[in-house]
UniProtKB/Swiss-Prot annotation:
The gene is SEC241. It is found in: Cytoplasm; Cytoplasmic vesicle, COPII-coated vesicle membrane; Endoplasmic reticulum membrane; Golgi apparatus membrane. The COPII coat is composed of at least 5 proteins: the SEC23/24 complex, the SEC13/31 complex, and the protein SAR1. Golgi apparatus membrane; Peripheral membrane protein; Cytoplasmic side. Transmembrane segments: none annotated. It holds the Pfam family Gelsolin. It is a peripheral membrane protein. Coiled coil: none annotated. Signal peptide: none annotated. It comes from Naumovozyma castellii (Yeast). GO terms for biological process: COPII-coated vesicle cargo loading; intracellular protein transport; macroautophagy; positive regulation of ER to Golgi vesicle-mediated transport; positive regulation of protein exit from endoplasmic reticulum. CDD domains: Sec24-like. Belongs to the SEC23/SEC24 family. SEC24 subfamily. Keywords: Cytoplasm, Cytoplasmic vesicle, Endoplasmic reticulum, ER-Golgi transport, Golgi apparatus, Membrane, Metal-binding, Protein transport, Transport, Zinc. This is Protein transport protein SEC24-1.
Length: 911
């Protein structure tokens, strides 16, 4: 491949250069307000390795080692690593510290004052290290530094030299669990004063398949738990001097150390300090028999397939059976016991009795049941069959199903009776019901009607009339399913109304998921590809069944709210018939009483059964420092986790009250945070004309994310089809954090001016991606090429004034009017390295191993003065409008731009 650089026009002014600030009325030398230190004066920016800002140089032993009594020394390595990672991205940020350095830490005692206090009070214990607060002016730090979206959260400063096995592995990885507050208020009154949520964002699994980077596994059957609170031994427990008792860090009870903790299964002595539970914050146990009420059941997949006229016309039936046929080997079957059942549905139920392959002369038999009120199962013993033993006959059936129903003219779909039949088929063992439908359920129990959208869309009645469950069957049925360990996944693909708001309840309360494919037509290869890719990844995904998850907190900490797809069995226990691998959960925490300890703990335990016939326990333990300083609380806020927590609360308000109330809540949350910060933490104010809008540096992206959230399809005002809005709400309430953020604030790449190495493999054979740009039209050039990624779809946007050479290199056509438009793939252009790099980037963005999503690609171009009247002008105009809604920093859909939003917040907080 030739690496000769193709030079296209590039912007003369880039963000970060002085002239861009002059565009917004900011002088060239406005790096910091007058009388305030520059970036180079901020301790955080000049931190030396091994030194916490404000703590001075570390003490050293004669041999160069750190003294043992410095409680922050081991944790400092983590802080230094995260500082190193963030320094480059923070270089372009416009920090605006407090008015003078004496107030840098918000009226903390100066060194002389500290010395005097210590002399008065006697020998004082060294203060524990805490994150420091660095204020900025949001209106000056503009455009917002979106590189912060990829930064790690503020470090959790914990004295690792105080635990049995000092190790960085004892600190919980943020991809498993994130706390909105990495310094916990010691009292509920302080927590309320902050106006910040105290929540945990929990992602128990990081990959679709369990064999990728699994956590350490204890296979010896040794499980040590506190006899009072039932928490599991973890890195933060303590042993007494003789090592015979251990102190629980959750409830502070001393427990006897079992003798088997120091012995191997073969009765030889072992070193307890090498055990995984004392070294790692995330660990998994192979559970003994007492953790099982029964033998782990086989994995069972029951497919309810729509064979009505709609499913035939749009090609969904053929696409489904072909994909299932091609992926039978991908179904998890580690123990060889996986079972399968297929049920076709229109206005009746079509069962299939599938004989085993060794039964010569026996063929698959179809049995029809038309009495939906009293449906029975003709031959239950041959309806749910072993995948291995009946493999050939299953393949034969999947090949014949499209032929059997190819002339079907029935436009009915009896989903309710089909669900009841599937329930009766699998109630003894449990399992997963997968529904594939192109038709609104319109006959039998649970039949639905098309709602009146015209009169309710965009009105205060929208939530209650269009986004609530239309029939209680879809909630009560999930209660039955949870009792027998059945979950439900929905794949809805149609050009017609499907009532996603109602049907999504099936997945929501059973631990499943609803996938929506509006306007689906298998005749469009892009639609068929997206459905097939996602359906195939869903089939191959590892799952756990018979799952319960509980979070235990140390003294004063209690979980009170739960968000995600599961059934809340009790006040602190979440039940999952099936736990998929591509979901995340948010737990809200309250403080029942004041916390006296310097550190608090939360432990999440998940009891589950695997497809390997094993019962396991996954334990995640999080340690957090506590504080009675609101400044230290704000300095340790994880702005991304806070966004996730507020998003879940906004979803609840959208579904329970109104969309207007949800938007009001989002904006009010930002106002409350800014007002509290100004009232409690801003030491000095300037005159009214130059009054800044202060917030701490670690939260500078929070207002942007919340503002962008109001413009998301789930919340934005205006006319949005109810199925699309309901699908967006359903997606956001369960998607892992990094995809939630991309859904809120889309990632945009500039392709026409990307460096030579971008789009090509690095030393690890990973395609290098461009640096994202701000989601604003001011970031665009009329002659540029841009790629927008919202986590669900991709948009390749060509500027209307692009040079012919750029168009030819990208699409292989000499004229911009000839470039492809709409939902399609980038054509392969031989001997065009630029075209190959574009396709490499798109493929990299689609290559996920933690979610099943396969983004559709939409190609469009901007309008230009030379645009002729074209047949697809309406489609192109709609596509431009849709793509422009992703420029969330701008004025779109009647909402204000981000700068105006900040100005509005400044006015409100100044009252």
């Amino acid at each position: 491949m030739s690496h000769k650089k193709r030079v296209y026009p590039t912007a003369q002014l880039q963000y970060g250069q002085t002239n861009i600030y002059e565009q917004h009325g900011v002088p060239q030398d406005a790096g910091a307000p007058q009388g305030q230190p520059l970036q180079s004066d901020i301790p955080y920016m000049n931190a030396q390795p091994g030194v916490i800002p404000g703590q001075g140089a570390p003490m050293m032993m004669d041999n160069g080692a750190m003294p043992q009594q410095q409680m922050f020394t081991p944790a400092q390595q983590q802080l230094n690593q995260q500082i190193d990672q963030t320094t480059a991205a923070m270089g372009n940020m416009q920090f605006n510290p407090a008015a003078n350095e004496s107030n840098m830490y918000y009226q903390q005692p100066l060194p002389q004052q500290q010395q005097q206090q210590q002399q008065q009070q006697g020998p004082a214990k060294p203060p524990k290290p805490m994150n420091q607060l660095y204020p900025i002016d949001l209106l000056v730090a503009f455009p917002p530094p979106i590189s912060d979206l990829s930064l790690p959260p503020p470090p959790i400063l914990f004295p690792l030299d105080t635990i049995p096995v000092p190790s960085e592995d004892a600190l919980a990885p943020s991809n498993y669990i994130r706390s909105t507050l990495n310094a916990v208020p010691k009292s509920n009154s302080l927590l309320k004063k902050t106006k910040l949520p105290f929540s945990l964002v929990i992602t128990p699994y990081q990959h679709l398949h369990d064999d990728i980077n699994p956590p350490p596994l204890n296979e010896d059957g040794t499980i040590v738990r506190c006899r009072r609170c039932r928490s599991y031994m973890n890195p933060f427990v303590h042993f007494n001097q003789d090592g015979r008792r251990w102190k629980c860090n959750i409830c502070n009870l001393f427990n006897e150390v079992p003798s088997f903790l120091d012995r191997m299964p073969n009765d030889t002595m072992s070193n307890r300090y090498m055990r995984n539970e004392l070294r790692y914050s995330v660990v998994e146990y192979l559970a003994p028999k007492e953790y099982s009420l029964r033998q782990p059941p086989p994995s069972t997949y029951t497919f309810i397939i729509d064979v009505s006229q709609n499913a035939m016309k749009n090609g969904l039936l053929g696409t489904t059976t072909r994909t299932l046929l091609d992926n039978l080997d991908s179904l998890p079957n580690h123990d060889g016991r996986t079972r399968i059942s297929i049920l076709c549905v229109d206005n009746g139920l079509h069962y299939f009795a599938i004989p085993s392959d060794d039964q010569e002369g026996q063929q698959v038999e179809m049995m029809d049941v038309c009495d939906l009120d009293d449906a029975f199962i003709p031959r239950p013993d041959s309806m749910v069959v072993n995948l291995v033993q009946c493999r050939n006959n299953i393949e034969t059936l999947l090949t014949k199903i499209p032929q059997i129903f190819q002339n079907n003219i029935i436009n009915k779909f009896a989903l309710g009776p089909a669900l009841q039949a599937a329930y009766n088929l699998t109630r003894n063992e449990g399992g997963k019901i997968i529904v594939v439908s192109a038709t609104l359920p319109n006959i039998g129990v649970g039949q639905l009607k098309k709602r009146v959208e015209e009169a309710n869309v965009g009105t205060p009645k929208e939530s209650q009339q269009l986004l609530t469950c239309q029939d209680p069957f879809y909630k009560t049925f999930t209660i039955q399913c949870n009792k027998v360990q059945i979950s439900i996944d929905m794949f809805l693909a149609s050009e017609e109304y499907m009532d996603v708001a109602t049907l999504a309840n099936l997945g929501h309360f059973s631990g499943g998921q609803t996938h929506f494919y509006p306007g689906f037509s298998a005749q469009r290869i892009t639609d068929a590809t997206k459905f097939s890719m996602e359906f195939a990844k869903h089939l191959s995904m590892d799952t756990s069944n018979e799952v319960v998850m509980r979070a235990r907190g140390s003294t004063g900490i209690r979980t009170t709210g739960f968000h995600g797809h599961f059934f809340n069995r009790s006040s602190d226990l979440c039940a999952f018939s099936i736990m998929n691998r591509d979901q995340s959960y948010v737990f809200d925490i309250t403080l029942d009483e004041n916390i006296a300890a310097e550190y608090c703990y939360v432990q999440v335990a998940i009891l589950l059964s695997l497809n390997t016939s094993q019962r396991r326990i996954r334990v995640i333990t999080l340690a957090l420092p506590t504080t009675d300083s609101i400044a230290e609380v704000y300095a340790s806020v994880d702005q991304l986790a806070v966004t996730a927590a507020f998003t879940q609360k906004a979803i609840d308000k959208a579904q329970d009250t109104s969309l207007e109330e949800a938007r009001r809540f989002i904006n009010q949350s930002v106002e409350d945070v800014l007002t509290t910060y100004k009232k409690e933490l801003v030491v000095q104010n300037t005159g009214a004309g130059g009054m800044p809008l202060r917030l701490c540096a670690n939260m500078k992206i929070f207002p942007l994310l919340m503002h962008a959230l109001t413009k998301n399809l789930a919340f934005r005002p205006g006319r949005v089809p109810s199925d699309h809005r309901a699908a967006a709400l359903n997606y956001m309430e369960s998607v892992p954090l990094k995809y939630l953020l991309k859904c809120i604030y889309p990632t945009i790449y500039s392709l026409h001016d990307m460096p030579d190495e971008v789009g090509l493999p690095d030393e690890n054979n990973e395609i290098i991606l461009p640096e994202p740009i701000n989601a604003s039209y001011s970031s665009f050039e009329t002659y540029g090429l841009y790629l927008i990624d919202n986590g669900i779809d991709l948009f390749l946007w060509m500027g209307g004034e692009a040079l012919p050479q750029l168009v030819e290199d990208a699409f292989g056509v000499p004229n911009i009017l000839e470039m492809p438009i709409g939902k399609q793939e980038v054509p392969v252009v031989p001997e065009s390295p630029f075209n190959e790099r574009i396709r490499n980037i798109i493929n990299r963005l689609r290559n996920h191993d933690d979610v099943i999503t396969y983004q559709s690609l939409y190609i469009l171009r901007s309008a230009s003065n030379s645009d002729p009247v074209q047949a697809n002008a309406k489609e192109l105009s709609s596509l431009r409008m849709w793509a422009s809604t992703h420029l969330v920093e701008d004025k779109i859909m009647g909402s204000e731009g981000y700068r105006d939003f900040l100005q509005m917040m400044k006015n409100k907080t100044s009252k």
